[in-house]
Amino acid sequence: MKQISLLGSTGSIGTQTLDVIRDYPDQFTLSALACGTNLELCRNQIKEFQPKLVSVQRPEDAQTLAGEFGDSIEFLYGEEGLKEVARYSESDIVVTAITGSIGLLPTLSAIKAKKAVAIANKETLVSAGHLVVSAAKENDVPLIPVDSEHSAIFQALNGEPKKAVDRLILTASGGSFRDKSRAELDGVTVEQALAHPNWSMGAKVTIDSATMMNKGLEVIEAKWLFGLDYDQIDVLIHKESIIHSMVEYVDRSVIAQLGTPDMRVPIQYALTYPERFARPKHERLDLAELGKLHFEKMDMERFRCMKLAYEAGRAGGTMTTVLNAANEVAVCRFLQGEITFLEIERIIEEALSAHSPIAHPSLEEIQAVDASIRKQLQA
């Protein structure tokens, strides 16, 4: 029986992780969970899965839940609560399904407690990848990717040495506006941006998909997870989201991982690795019915956030911290109706242009830069 700590239980990845746990009650137990402010859903999850430790965002919510459930469950809150869930002694693996750089400290806490980490929180690797990877190596902790693209690469690599790999090819659906010209993007609405053609995701990642920043963040994530240079990581538009990513080897063999677009598949693989469990209810891929798969080159001028991500990644240091923080603030402001869709990339570009990067930042320096950028852009 594998004990699981889940960070971000009420979000898209979190609820789909619970679907997997629900499907395999003899294999998985939810020992601890952390969520934000969705108290109603959290309450239902506690009743169903009966974790021993729960953390919420606000102290008053922790007090409310403690009054309802009594002493059989420990309730915590805030940043310390997140870290406690991440390093909970009874857990074997931690799923970091929380969105944003708030996931950094609990991820490091899980690693230092020598917990296996199923990482779905790409912002942590973007803002502080060198610290996370270094800590994982130091503590001999596996970082198992949950994102469909990185799970695909993880499977396609299958233990091959790095010297055998020529390049990684991440696929991208193109997002909500893949068929619109750049001129047509000027007046798009929040509702239009949230209508993703293939995947069911949270609001932030859906907007990131529309700007193509999500794929940019995934390029940086891939660099840290697999230890390759940016020149070895390419992106290809693939509208059907059937090929989740590919690895091209030095002998020009290309190995791809295919499947219908359902996040529960890579989530399950991260939880069961190195084993595979059957999913009899899952839709089987029928290539004959699909008939054709389509691919397009990535247009860096149309999708400028992708270009910014590569530039920040190559610059290194705190440039990716700025990229991530500026993007989080800009997306939040767009969702609140404060800025237009195309202003997201402008805000990010201006923040990057104004920043003097620190080459090898400490955790404290990353936190300071992150806080400074957020304060500037929220003003």
Curated annotation (Swiss-Prot):
Keywords: Isoprene biosynthesis, Manganese, Metal-binding, NADP, Oxidoreductase. NADPH binds at T10, G11, S12, I13, G36, N38, N121, E123, G202. Its EC number is 1.1.1.267. Mn(2+) binds at D147, E149, E218. Catalyzes the NADPH-dependent rearrangement and reduction of 1-deoxy-D-xylulose-5-phosphate (DXP) to 2-C-methyl-D-erythritol 4-phosphate (MEP). Its cofactor is Mg(2+); Mn(2+). HAMAP family: DXP_reductoisom. It comes from Shouchella clausii (strain KSM-K16). This is 1-deoxy-D-xylulose 5-phosphate reductoisomerase. It catalyses: 2-C-methyl-D-erythritol 4-phosphate + NADP(+) = 1-deoxy-D-xylulose 5-phosphate + NADPH + H(+).
